[in-house]
Design a protein with these regions (language model features):
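Conserved alpha/beta-hydrolase
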Residues: 1-13
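Acidic beta-to-alpha connecting loop that harbors the catalytic carboxylate
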Residues: 67, 130-131, 153-156, 184-185
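Conserved alpha/beta-hydrolase "acid-adjacent" motif
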Residues: 135, 156-163
Length: 185
């Protein structure tokens, strides 16, 4: 198991953000998180990390929660876009608006970027990913890894309907082998 640390968007930064001592993370952090994971995989592949371990580096599963889940989606092949961020972040009366939008809307200037997919990632477990504004529903076919998305019905930060259920409506992602687990509570 590799557990990356993401300076600039780690637990200390989140604590400072919630206390009002810091602004949301720099939009560039949206790109840095998946690149951090790919760099760790490169280190294992090059033999500079976990030396002497037998690791199938070409068959990797990633797991992420919240923003880490967003990074896992990027590593799995979804590409971020500012299309919805540009219009919906300005609408304070949007009925789907939720607390996760604070983070998603802070990514506006960093959203349009090249794919950060890592071909070594074959599966992803993503828990409560803020994704409704950040990814287009049409980007599902670009997923190269199988994704298990887990969301809770009482998650008030990243609510399941707008952030998990709505992006998967239409059946295409589910028809391609991806799965949604909607936990009651």
């Amino acid at each position: 198991v590799l557990l990356p640390s993401h300076p600039g968007s780690d637990a200390d930064q989140q604590k400072d953000l919630l206390s009002g001592a810091a602004a949301p993370p720099n939009p560039e952090e949206l790109r840095f998180r998946p690149l951090d994971v790919s760099a760790l995989l490169d280190g294992v592949e090059a033999g500079t990390l976990l030396v002497g371990q037998q690791i199938a580096i070409d068959d990797v599963a990633v797991v992420g929660h919240s923003w880490g889940a967003t990074a896992a989606m990027q590593l799995s092949g979804l590409q971020t876009t500012s299309r919805k961020l540009k219009t919906r972040c300005q609408d304070l009366r949007d009925p789907a608006r939720n607390l996760s939008w604070v983070l998603q809307c802070s990514w506006l200037s960093g959203a349009d970027q090249e794919s950060l997919a890592d071909p070594r990632v074959k599966a992803a477990v993503v828990v409560s990913p803020p994704m409704n504004l950040l990814f287009d529903e049409s980007s599902g076919p670009s997923l190269q890894a199988k994704v298990l998305l887990v969301s809770g019905t009482r998650d008030w930060v990243v609510p399941s309907d707008p952030e998990a259920v709505v992006p998967l409506q239409g059946g295409k992602p589910l028809a391609n082998g991806h799965r949604l687990v909607l936990a009651s509570g």
